[in-house]
């Protein structure tokens, strides 16, 4: 695949491996496929209108990059498509898949400087579709913004912890980097769109990175160190305004409702002839009219009823006379009291 892969002896083993990520991918060299490819393979992908100007500017660099791997690239601005093809000199059978991923990333607004990294052996890409994970558009926009974070801080922290380049564009999230990091990015993105805040996964990745440094904890379970997320937003069914109380269960069927004939039999109306029924109806109608006329008269005469008057209280003059103090009697009383004191 990539010529800049470090050439060194690979430790091939047939025994079980504890950590598959630690294994080195063996380099594929031209000597491994001296006869080249039998048939021509090609892949094409469409790109949006707003990417036309950028792709037109960087296309000479794309052709130069793919020519190093003996691939041919075509840009059709009329149709709005990019095509990559193998040539007779192409010796790597998987490089056409890598170049297909590169043009897909460029169509999803990934810059060429980042997209060309996918041609390396230890680098892959993942385009995560998030448009159909949330039904309501308002929730989708809110959760997608939560993935980016304030001033792109959350996205930057994800990139630092996973060693991947992540780009949120429209209804997709494009990730580019090592395969282990791509798995972590996919988990974070899917959890975020399922209403799990990315800070929980970021904390878990930070804790795992610290635990990896301790060789004593290499063979132990790390679940006790990781934060546990509890969903507090329990969706409750909307309760009706007026609840109907449940009737007591009975094994018997409900009683059959009374029919019109049953009601007439109960009142005795069933046995009356036509004239008697009409007379009864007329009598009921007259009674209703008389009751309604009586209520209407009461409502009309209500305005002519005199209001109740309060009984007059005692006048101010009479109240003042009642409260008047007899000064002469008070003087005589005081003089009498002083004489008693002098005698004693």
Swiss-Prot record:
Quaternary structure (record): Monomer. Component of the ribosomal small subunit (SSU) processome.
Matches recorded under SUPFAM superfamilies: Eukaryotic type KH-domain (KH-domain type I)
Region (Disordered): 230-326
Domain KH: 126-194
Predominant place of localization: nucleus
Keywords: Coiled coil, Developmental protein, Nucleus, Ribonucleoprotein, Ribosome biogenesis, RNA-binding, rRNA processing
GO cellular component terms given for this protein: nucleolus; nucleoplasm; small-subunit processome
Record's protein name: KRR1 small subunit processome component homolog
Keyword presence, Translocase: no
């Amino acid at each position: 695949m990539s010529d800049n892969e470090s050439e060194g002896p690979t430790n091939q083993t047939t025994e079980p491996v504890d950590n598959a990520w630690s294994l080195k991918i063996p380099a594929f060299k031209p000597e491994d496929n001296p006869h080249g490819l039998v048939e021509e393979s090609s892949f094409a992908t469409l790109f949006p209108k707003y990417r036309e100007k950028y792709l037109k500017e960087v296309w000479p660099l794309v052709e130069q990059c793919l020519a190093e791997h003996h691939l041919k690239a075509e840009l059709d601005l009329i149709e709005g498509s990019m095509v990559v093809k193998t040539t007779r000199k192409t010796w790597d059978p998987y490089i056409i898949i890598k170049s297909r991923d590169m043009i897909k990333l460029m169509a999803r607004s990934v810059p060429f400087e980042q997209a060309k990294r996918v041609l390396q052996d230890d680098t892959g890409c993942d385009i995560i579709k998030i448009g159909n994970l949330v039904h309501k558009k308002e929730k989708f926009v809110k959760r997608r913004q939560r993935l980016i974070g304030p001033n792109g801080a959350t996205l930057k922290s994800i990139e630092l912890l996973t060693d991947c380049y992540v780009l949120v564009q429209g209804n997709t999230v494009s990730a580019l980097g090592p395969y282990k990091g791509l798995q972590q990015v996919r988990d974070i993105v899917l959890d975020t769109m399922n209403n799990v805040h990315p800070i929980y996964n970021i904390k878990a990745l930070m804790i795992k990175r610290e635990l990896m440094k301790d060789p004593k904890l290499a063979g132990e379970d790390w679940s006790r160190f990781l934060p546990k997320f509890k969903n507090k937003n329990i969706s409750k069914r909307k309760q009706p305004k007026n609840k109907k109380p449940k009737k007591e269960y009975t094994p018997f069927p409900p009683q059959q409702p009374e029919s019109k004939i049953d009601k007439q039999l109960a009142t005795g109306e069933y046995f009356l002839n036509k004239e008697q029924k009409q007379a009864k109806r007329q009598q009921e109608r007259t009674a209703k009219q008389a009751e309604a006329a009586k209520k209407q008269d009461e409502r009309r005469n209500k305005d002519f009823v005199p209001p109740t008057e309060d009984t007059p209280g005692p006048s101010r003059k009479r109240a003042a006379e009642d409260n008047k103090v007899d000064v002469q009697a008070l003087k005589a009383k005081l003089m009498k009291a002083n004489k008693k004191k002098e005698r004693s």
